[in-house]
C-alpha cells in the first residue's frame, strides 16, 4: 500500500509533468501561430484558429500517449506477476 509520502511524491511528479507539457505546448504553438513582429494588440482570427488547433492537437497526442503508456505499463505488470508466480 502506498504511503502518504509516496502519494505526495506521485502528485508532485504529475504537477511537474503537466507544467512541462504546458510550457512546451505554449512555446511550440506560440512559435508556430503568432508572428514575432506584433502588428496588433489582439490576436487575429487566423492566429486564434491556429492556436486553437495547435493546442487541441497537442492535448490529443498527450492523451493518446498517456493511454498507450498506461496500457504498456499494465501489460508489463501482468508479465512480471506471471514470472513471479512461476
Swiss-Prot record:
Its main location: mitochondrion. One of its GO terms (molecular function) is metal ion binding. Disulfide bonds join 29-54, 33-50. GO terms for biological process: protein insertion into mitochondrial inner membrane; regulation of multicellular organism growth. Gene3D superfamilies: Mitochondrial import inner membrane translocase subunit tim13 like domains (1.10.287.810). The twin CX3C motif contains 4 conserved Cys residues that form 2 disulfide bonds in the mitochondrial intermembrane space. However, during the transit of tim-10/tin-10 from cytoplasm into mitochondrion, the Cys residues probably coordinate zinc, thereby preventing folding and allowing its transfer across mitochondrial outer membrane. Belongs to the small Tim family. Heterohexamer; composed of 3 copies of tim-9/tin-9.1 and 3 copies of tim-10/tin-10, named soluble 70 kDa complex. The complex associates with the tim-22 component of the TIM22 complex. Interacts with multi-pass transmembrane proteins in transit. PANTHER family: MITOCHONDRIAL IMPORT INNER MEMBRANE TRANSLOCASE SUBUNIT TIM10. This is Mitochondrial import inner membrane translocase subunit Tim10. It comes from Caenorhabditis elegans.
Amino acid at each position: 500500500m502506498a504511503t502518504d509520502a509516496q502519494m505526495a511524491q506521485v502528485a508532485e511528479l504529475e504537477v511537474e509533468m503537466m507544467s512541462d507539457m504546458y510550457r512546451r505546448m505554449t512555446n511550440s504553438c506560440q512559435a508556430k501561430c503568432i508572428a514575432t513582429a506584433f502588428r496588433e494588440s489582439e490576436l487575429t482570427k487566423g492566429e486564434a484558429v491556429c492556436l486553437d488547433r495547435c493546442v487541441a492537437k497537442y492535448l490529443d497526442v498527450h492523451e493518446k500517449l498517456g493511454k498507450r503508456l498506461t496500457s504498456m505499463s499494465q501489460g508489463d505488470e501482468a508479465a512480471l506477476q506471471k514470472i513471479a508466480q512461476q
